[in-house]
């Protein structure tokens, strides 16, 4: 007799799976068989053959669906977590003098511990059981080992830099920062703890230069600060050129203003001189006119007095004296008249000279000729 489990049935036949992996087909004498039921068959009814991979595809769709769902669940709960725990989500470097880099998985566990120099290799060799250990515990072990070997002392700087594979995963980043802050708070009273973040491009550049990410960032910061100091201490060539151009423009403007001011002062001086000369000439003319008016008034008064008064009889000697006095008065009158004409000629000449200064093109004034033509002729001419 053979035993088997019913895996399929229809109205005529049932299919059995034997313990040795054979499929047997037998007649369905009883319609009350159930799938999964174990039954006994006579040996002569054996129709078996060994099960093959292709028999799986001959199962009914319902059974096929159940099997597929079971496989998916196994992959999600068994295979996928194993794969995820072996993937690096972040890289963290610790710089004391030994430099070590840790790779963290999704559970914040260390999956890789890489020394970055000879001292770092010694530290890695001294640490046991670091794989799949929380990164805070590994940091504690690294600091303790460095302290025992004299690599780190009190007040020395410990630099921790973190690089994330997926910079958009804010949940993971916040969790790492929180745990790293706990480590910093723990050691800040003993050492100078500093933490910073960077990106994958910076990490690759640091690897090419053979240094840690933190050391690479610090080195670039020093170079940038040095360049900034050099730039601030030395003015650029463009600024020098602009300042020189501004100074030249200011100098040209000052020279132009000075020249204009000098021309204006010369014109003002010439005008003031002309005005003074004209005033002096006018004063001389006024004085001459006053003298003439006074003399004419005296002569008029004398003539009137002669009409009303009888001329006294004088002896010849007195008459001769009077004639001499009259001749003297007439000569004095001629001298006064000549002096007035000379003063007018001098004032006219000065005005002509002033006019020449105001007219640099050389056009002469006709005032002198006009005045000479209008001036009265001397008595007796």
Curated annotation (Swiss-Prot):
Residues 2-50 form the RsgI N-terminal anti-sigma domain. PROSITE patterns: RSGI_N. Residues 200-210, 219-244, 273-321, 349-359 have a biased composition (Basic and acidic residues). It is found in: Cell membrane. Induction: Part of the sigI-rsgI operon, which is transiently induced by heat stress. Expression is positively regulated by SigI via the sigma-I promoter. In exponentially growing cells, expression is regulated by the WalRK two-component system, which represses the sigma-I promoter and activates the sigma-A promoter, leading to the formation of a basal level of RsgI. WalRK can also positively and directly regulate transcription of the operon under heat stress through a binding site located upstream of the sigma-I promoter. Repressed by glucose. GO terms for cellular component: plasma membrane. Keywords: Cell membrane, Membrane, Stress response, Transmembrane, Transmembrane helix. The chain crosses the membrane at residues 64-84. Signal peptide: none annotated. Residues 198-381 are annotated as: Disordered. Anti-sigma factor for SigI. Negatively regulates SigI activity through direct interaction. Interacts (via RsgI N-terminal anti-sigma domain) with SigI. This is Anti-sigma-I factor RsgI. It comes from Bacillus subtilis (strain 168).
């Amino acid at each position: 007799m053979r035993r088997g489990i019913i895996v399929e049935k229809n109205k005529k036949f049932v299919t059995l799976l034997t313990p040795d992996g054979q499929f047997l087909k037998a007649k369905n004498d009883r319609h009350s068989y159930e799938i999964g039921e174990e039954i006994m068959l006579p040996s002569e009814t054996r129709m078996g053959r060994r099960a093959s991979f292709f028999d799986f595809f001959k199962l009914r769709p319902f059974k096929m669906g159940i099997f597929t769902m079971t496989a998916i669940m196994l992959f999600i709960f068994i295979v996928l977590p194993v794969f995820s725990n072996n993937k690096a989500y972040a890289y963290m470097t610790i710089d004391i003098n030994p430099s070590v880099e840790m790779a963290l998985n999704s559970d914040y566990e260390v999956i890789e511990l890489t020394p970055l120099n000879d001292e770092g290799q010694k530290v890695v060799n001294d640490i046991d059981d670091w794989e799949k250990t929380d990164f805070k515990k590994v940091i504690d072990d690294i600091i303790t080992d460095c302290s025992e070997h004299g690599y780190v002392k009190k007040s020395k700087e410990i630099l921790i830099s973190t690089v994330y594979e997926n910079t958009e995963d804010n949940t993971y980043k916040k969790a790492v920062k929180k745990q790293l802050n706990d480590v910093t708070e723990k050691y800040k009273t003993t050492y100078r703890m500093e933490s910073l973040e960077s990106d994958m491009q910076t990490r690759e550049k640091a690897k090419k230069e053979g240094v840690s990410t933190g050391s690479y960032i610090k080195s670039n910061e020093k170079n940038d600060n040095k360049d900034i100091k050099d730039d601030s201490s030395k003015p650029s060539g463009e600024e020098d050129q602009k300042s020189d151009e501004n100074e030249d423009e200011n100098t040209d403007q000052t020279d132009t203003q000075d020249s204009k001011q000098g021309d204006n002062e010369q014109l003002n001086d010439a005008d003031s001189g002309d005005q003074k000369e004209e005033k002096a000439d006018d004063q001389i003319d006024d004085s001459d006119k006053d003298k003439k008016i006074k003399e004419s008034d005296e002569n008029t008064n004398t003539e009137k007095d002669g009409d009303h008064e009888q001329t006294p009889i004088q002896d010849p000697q007195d008459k001769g004296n009077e004639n001499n006095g009259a001749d003297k008065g007439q000569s004095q009158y001629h001298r006064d008249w000549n002096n007035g004409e000379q003063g007018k000629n001098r004032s006219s000449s000065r005005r002509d000279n002033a006019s020449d200064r105001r007219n640099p093109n050389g056009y002469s004034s006709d005032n002198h000729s006009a005045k000479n033509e209008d001036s009265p002729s001397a008595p007796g001419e």
